């Protein structure tokens, strides 16, 4: 079996650049996922993020989760649960406007650290989008502009903890899905595993590695590349031992951004056979996704194509 792609971003400097870019290209085309090491975010800083996130869970969220489990009788289930996930979560919004100062129960240090964390990940996301542009033969800045909308991209973080589960065979940590948005950057627990992706009909573990950032591609990048890159189904398997930390940051298009395949990536044959992905306003896709997240993505694309309107397309200026 092929090894899960692990990419050292330091390889972009010097003679290793071509090989590193080829690894990124292969990961985007064949996996939809890859793991970054030497990505430029200091390891000491990531240690602080992890420590404060786990402290916050223990102090503010753990008891609430136990009460939720008890109220729904989840510890005693005998049949598979298909309408809930075994996870404790909260959300932080960064762009276009941050809500970190308004989120309750966050210690000041944790609040400030997560603001800094968001800035570092935003910078990394935009660097990666330009690397994808380079591999796709698009102008530098094309993908960032494609995401822009009126007020810039949307960017937020889902902070999750997956506590020990007595019946992991009956309830998932997170049910299988593809991500609706653009580029996802995940800082995950390196001691407790659980994340899996679907490749060639097999569920494959995403290896937990200390201080790495896991990248996966969302549905919008599949549309913009007209299927050259694809979003991939993934899930979280609950574990009987240990609480798994997951901090997933989503660099997505602005709500009013018009998403459509980059013209240079639409081959003539695909156009003639009407094998071109739809164009739509990102917010409209998200409304559809909200009710269909845990279902296959293809019907979502078909539904958007069916209601496709004459949205005015203007060339994406990258200069």
UniProtKB/Swiss-Prot annotation:
A UniProt-annotated Pfam family: DIOX_N
Pathway, per record: Alkene biosynthesis; ethylene biosynthesis via S-adenosyl-L-methionine; ethylene from S-adenosyl-L-methionine: step 2/2
UniProt KW Cell membrane keyword: no
Swiss-Prot/TrEMBL keywords: Ethylene biosynthesis, Fruit ripening, Iron, Metal-binding, Oxidoreductase, Vitamin C
Annotated residues for binding of Fe cation: 177, 179, 234
Catalytic function, reaction form: 1-aminocyclopropane-1-carboxylate + L-ascorbate + O2 = ethene + L-dehydroascorbate + hydrogen cyanide + CO2 + 2 H2O
Alphabetized GO MF terms: 1-aminocyclopropane-1-carboxylate oxidase activity; L-ascorbic acid binding; metal ion binding
Cited Gene3D superfamilies: B-lactam Antibiotic, Isopenicillin N Synthase, Chain
UniProt signal peptide: none
GO biological-process terms attached to the record: ethylene biosynthetic process; fruit ripening
Cofactor(s) the protein requires to work: Fe cation
Domain of life: Eukaryota
Domain Fe2OG dioxygenase: 153-253
InterPro entries (alphabetical): DIOX_N, IPNS-like_FE2OG_OXY, IPNS-like_sf, Oxoglu/Fe-dep_dioxygenase_dom, Plant_2OG-oxidoreductases
EC number, UniProt record: 1.14.17.4
Membership in a protein family: Belongs to the iron/ascorbate-dependent oxidoreductase family.
Name of protein: 1-aminocyclopropane-1-carboxylate oxidase
Biological source species: Prunus mume
Gene name of the encoded protein: ACO1
